[in-house]
């Protein structure tokens, strides 16, 4: 006999109704989240491509310069969602097998001669007949995965009602990154990308013209690459006595790879095992 949650107040095991990633009902992941949040500030288990940070700085700057409703969060998110979807499409089309691209599963299933970014990304389209939206969270990939990260890295300010600021804005550091990102994208590609986002559609054949937006390729020697490196090696916070846990963690990983380059098959397991053994020796 089925019961409802209103009828039973004690904890009970129930059938899992649907598959969904990210759920942690017993808070088993809490300790891990606390540890990596402290050890690698600005990096999480879902921020798999650091170039997303530069992309978001650039697209928010472009949106602000290009639309008439400057202080509208709804408009800002409308175009940032379309931009995320377009980025997923161009990655799937041009760089098969590259991981860490949010929305890529949707993009792979919905490639067509004429691609509607509007129907695939706009929140208003979720009730219309069709393949659905590329991302269920209203603020998109940015809101779910990267908004906290770019704030921790001092790149993007969050909306603040106290100062009548309804949108995400760039810090000076974010503006610098947006400019550096833009320098690595030819003007014709930037224009095509934005016009496609603004109009809500693009031809599949035009995706090949947007390869400079590749998330896995950051030109060597570029100021964009330098900003990422400095951000990762900088202090974790602005306290009087700042911590450098992220920098020290990166050093440990690089040292481990340098020492065990040929034998490392699973970096995470190998790295944790080696450091655990090292800690045991120190304790003894």
Give the location of each predicted region.
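Non-catalytic recognition/regulatory regions in large multidomain proteins
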Residues: 1-284
């Amino acid at each position: 006999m089925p019961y409802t949650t209103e009828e039973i107040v004690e904890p009970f095991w129930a059938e899992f109704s649907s598959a969904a990633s990210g759920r942690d009902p017993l808070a088993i992941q809490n300790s891990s989240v606390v540890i990596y949040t402290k050890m690698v500030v600005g990096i999480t288990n879902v921020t798999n491509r650091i170039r997303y940070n530069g992309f978001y700085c650039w697209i928010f700057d472009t949106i602000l310069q290009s639309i008439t409703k400057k202080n509208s969060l709804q408009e800002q998110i409308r175009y940032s969602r379309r931009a995320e979807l377009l980025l997923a499409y161009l990655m799937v089309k041009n760089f098969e097998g590259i991981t860490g691209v949010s929305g890529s599963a949707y993009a792979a299933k919905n490639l067509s001669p004429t691609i509607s970014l509007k129907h695939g990304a706009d929140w208003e389209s979720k009730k219309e007949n069709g393949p659905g939206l590329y991302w269920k969270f209203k603020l998109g990939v940015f809101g779910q995965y990267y908004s906290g990260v770019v704030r921790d890295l001092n790149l993007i300010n969050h909306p603040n009602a106290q100062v009548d600021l309804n949108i995400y804005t760039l810090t000076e550091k974010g503006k610098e990154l947006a400019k550096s990102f833009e320098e690595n994208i030819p003007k014709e590609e930037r224009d095509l990308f934005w016009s496609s986002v603004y109009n809500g559609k693009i031809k599949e054949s035009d995706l090949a013209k947007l390869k400079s937006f590749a998330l896995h390729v950051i030109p060597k020697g570029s100021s964009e690459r330098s900003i990422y490196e400095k951000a990762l090696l900088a202090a974790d916070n602005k306290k009087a006595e700042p911590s450098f846990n992220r920098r020290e963690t990166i050093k440990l990983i690089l040292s481990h790879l340098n020492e065990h380059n040929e034998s490392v098959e699973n970096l995470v397991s190998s790295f944790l095992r080696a450091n655990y053994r090292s800690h045991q020796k120190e304790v003894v």
